[in-house]
Amino acid sequence: LISDLRPPICNINSLDYLLSKLEEGTLCTDLTTLKKMIEDYNDLNIGEGRDLLLQIFDKMESIYKYDNGGNYLKVDSLAEYEGDFNILSETARESIERLAEMFVKLNTNVKRRGGRKNSLEEYQLKFIGKYGENCSIPFVEVINKDAGIGFPEYYKGGEGEAIELSDPIMQMFEKKYEEALLNGGHIEFYSKDLDDFQTDQSNSLDSFELNFNIKIINNDVKLYLGANIGSGQAGRSFGRFYGLSETVRETIKNLNHQNNTNVELSFVPKQIRLANVIQNYSDESYNTSFFTTSWDSENELRLEDIYIRYSDGKFHFTTIDGKNELKFTMNNMLNSDSQSRVLRLLVDLSEFEYGLSHWSLFPWDILAQERVYIPEILFEDITIATAQWNLSV
């Protein structure tokens, strides 16, 4: 059901939007009261709002009661910290920059097989076979299995992506793993270990994020790469907290608007309860909405407005006039593989050309799959994977 009562996911206060669409009546009165209660709760100090929060839950339950319970309200806590966040030394910053360069080199040079990579390469060949190169085709025609070529075979399910064991970088990790076991130490590699490998500056991400856990051990700052590593676009992991820092917001906006016209994909996910998680803010000029209303209908690109062509060795999304190069993005951390095939293909083809489809598979992941014990893995002085045992029960 598509209704203007269903609020946009981006750049909108959902409750304010809903109130603006409702006429005066019992529901509107109840929601206005609820809005005031939430605002009063937000003004309280941490620890003072328990009773009011329970009243809010009761009010929401009186409006609509979940049959099997559920969370009626998400509560975000913001801690004001007056200390110094500048705890990273210049040496640590330089190490992070070298780590970022290392990831770019791995994305460019590691040889992979199977999974998304092979499937999208086959999709390229099918497209060229039917339409040729340098020819812009309506996207809705391409994905029509009768008139076009449908969707990649990988979307039907299949083998996952793997790294070729003959890959030189994989072999280097294998050698360092064996040395670590013999010496009883950890696996450590350096920028110089990848000096023979180049990066393709014309075909790399405009920006990406790295996620770290920071610990102070014996007065020294120690960096641990986060379990999810990061994301393929600056700001994606910020979600609904994106607007808390205007300085950070402007920096991210400048990074992401260098080479393409970014189009934010705003959608209600298949798992409706995840809509709270992906509610976010976006500075993109254009948007394409799925299963919900647009926050900016004047700058919305419908599926019928999107064209696709293959040229210069890769796919390009454009508008009908071919002037704007489009890149479809999601300013959230939801895995697009779990969503509709149309949305998934827009993201995959936008990101595949920039190596992002390889973001979650690295040589140390292969080691962890095949070995009983993996020592701590360091890139220079940064821990990218802690020691682990693989136990079968």
Regions found by a protein language model. Name each.
Residues I2-E284, R302-E304, F315-I320:
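Type-3 copper protein
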Residues Y224-V393:
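C-terminal structured domains
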